Amino acid sequence: MRYLLTNDDGIYARGLSALYSELSKDADCLIVAPEVERSAVGHAITLNRPLMVRRTKKDGNFLGYAVSGTPADCVKIGIKELSEKPVDLVVSGINIGANVGINVIYSGTVSAATEGAILGVPSMAISLGTLRNADYTFAAHFARTMARFIMKYFEKKSVALNINVPALPVQDIKGYAVTRQGKARLIESFDRRVDPRERLYYWLAGETQLSEQEEPDSDGSALSRGMISITPIYHDMTRYDALDGLKALLSKETSLLPVAKCDFQD
């Protein structure tokens, strides 16, 4: 069985190493990851330059392939070119910091899992809910458990799961919850600075905050209660409940471009 492992924190990230150590107990794992940190690049892919790929080593042994592109690039090239056998599962992580709510859109970690599902491979993204002093031990163990679960029920299916593990002692984790993506978002602030040559620059800062309208079945809410959140995600971004209303409103307008009416139905 072949697992493709990637992340957005870079090929030498501790979270990826912990993931490999645990998942390699069950499967032949191939690491294909960005050569440097590519956090918050979303689902970007590289079109304007070639992807450079190099074999990397750790302690004298082959570690994996470092790619000059994004996490989504890594999944594409890993599945299509670098794996000499079919990939059965894509696992992205372990990310340092939670990926919940609207911030999922920005996440390279989650986008890597989404890309795997687009390519027809079951996938999961796993993140740890802390930005400092991360202990990946339990998150890696849970990733192994979920990998077994996915291979049992979703083998060869285009499914993607976004998993967030609270950064708590194991005994304090209050179980898991199947959740939906919530409304938590980054509350932006900018750190304004001036360099030695008097040039102005900014660092994007801020922190993720739960929305006042956050429902108890959301990913961010579960994580805040000390639970593991497991969210099925999908790349179709259509808002289906708005289709009929939009059609009705547009049908009333006469000032739009003079094109033939079409309801896009067969």
Swiss-Prot record:
Q: Which reaction is catalysed here?
A: a ribonucleoside 5'-phosphate + H2O = a ribonucleoside + phosphate
| Localisation per UniProt entry | Cytoplasm
Molecular function (GO) terms for this protein are: 3'-nucleotidase activity; 5'-nucleotidase activity; exopolyphosphatase activity; metal ion binding; nucleotide binding
Cofactors needed by this protein, per the record, are: a divalent metal cation
Predominant subcellular localization, coarse grouping: cytoplasm
Q: Which residues bind a divalent metal cation?
A: D8, D9, S39, N95
Against InterPro entries, the record matches this protein to: SurE, SurE-like_Pase/nucleotidase, SurE-like_sf
Q: Any idea of its EC number?
A: 3.1.3.5
State whether keyword Transmembrane applies: no
Q: Which domain of life is it from?
A: Bacteria
- Report keywords, A-Z: Cytoplasm, Hydrolase, Metal-binding, Nucleotide-binding
Q: Does the keyword Cell membrane apply?
A: no
Q: Which GO terms describe its cellular component?
A: cytoplasm
- Explain how, and how many, cofactor molecules are bound: Binds 1 divalent metal cation per subunit.
What NCBIfam families does the record tag this protein with?
A: PRK00346.1-4, PRK00346.2-2, surE
The UniProt similarity line reads:
Belongs to the SurE nucleotidase family.
Mind telling me what this protein is named? Answer: 5'-nucleotidase SurE
